[in-house]
Swiss-Prot record:
The family this protein is said to belong to: Belongs to the UPF0235 family.
Pfam families tied to this protein: DUF167
InterPro entries for the chain: DUF167, YggU-like_sf
Source domain of life: Archaea
Coiled-coil positions: none
CC terms in the record's Gene Ontology section: cytoplasm
Name under which the protein is recorded: UPF0235 protein MmarC7_0309
Organism of origin: Methanococcus maripaludis (strain C7 / ATCC BAA-1331)
């Protein structure tokens, strides 16, 4: 399932995520198998881009890499771009972080 969520592109690795805001803490949840997205919980509210900034900062800490929101800046369903990691690296990190694996 995780291989369907993490994709390679010309620019780098894309990850499909589903964001829940106003959470108790920032964390990676489980894989939403129906939507084929990784659930991310963020403490910030989606006001004036605060949640998007928090997502980028949180994921930068996990992947130790630059993170960009590739699509979905105004949606809870987003795709993030990691330009300088391999798919294998990203999958390995996610498998450590995801609660349902």
């Amino acid at each position: 399932m995780i291989e369907e969520i993490v994709k390679e592109s010309e620019k780098g690795i894309l990850i499909d995520i589903e964001v829940t805001t106003n959470a108790k803490k920032n964390e990676i949840g489980k894989i939403n198998e129906w939507r084929k997205r990784i659930e991310i919980r963020i403490r910030e509210q989606p006001i004036e881009g605060k949640a998007n900034k928090a997502i980028v900062k949180f994921l930068k800490g996990i992947f130790k890499s630059e993170i960009f929101i590739n699509s979905g800046t105004t949606s809870s369903q987003k795709t993030v771009l990691i330009p300088d990691k391999t798919k294998e690296d990203v999958v390995k990190i996610l498998k450590k972080e995801i609660k349902s694996i």
